[in-house]
Amino acid sequence: MDWRININMQDIKYIHYGSNSFDPIKFHPIKNVPFYTKPEGGLWASRTNKDFGWKDWCKKRQYHTEKLEESFQFIVAPEANIIEIHSCEDLKSIPQASLLTAMYIPDFESLASNGVDAIEVFISEDIALYDNLLGWDVDSILIMNPEIIVLS
């Protein structure tokens, strides 16, 4: 597998909005959604040090701003297996769920079953990612394995 894996994540802090704490019982396994670039399940977050993260996007678009009042921060375990997507070229290196669409639809179930704990997408580094991953509006991480979440 020729995926870009980030190994040194200990100093990177993430924030999840919509809840004040992480409840592993509420974590749902990853499930592909046909013809959609985002799966069901997992936990979504963005880096705390980003200039334009999820909180900023929600405020600008007036999207569920009431959910921004609750949040929790975490880091990921040092042994976490995380794919970083910085460009459309990176995106092409991961399994695709469907070839029947013009959009690139990652096979999240395949990634998770092959030991990938999370996927982090850097939309800000390649604007074409925004078009190819419709629905990924800002740089964000999708946690697919709850065991890598370390509360801070």
Positions of predicted regions on the chain:
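Residues immediately flanking
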Residues: 48-49, 123
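A short, charged, amphipathic alpha-helix used as a generic interaction element across diverse proteins
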Residues: 40, 49-58
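A short, exposed loop/beta-hairpin motif centered on an aromatic-Gly-Thr core
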Residues: 26, 30-47
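Active-site and NAD+-binding cores of ADP-ribose-processing enzymes
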Residues: 6-32, 59-152
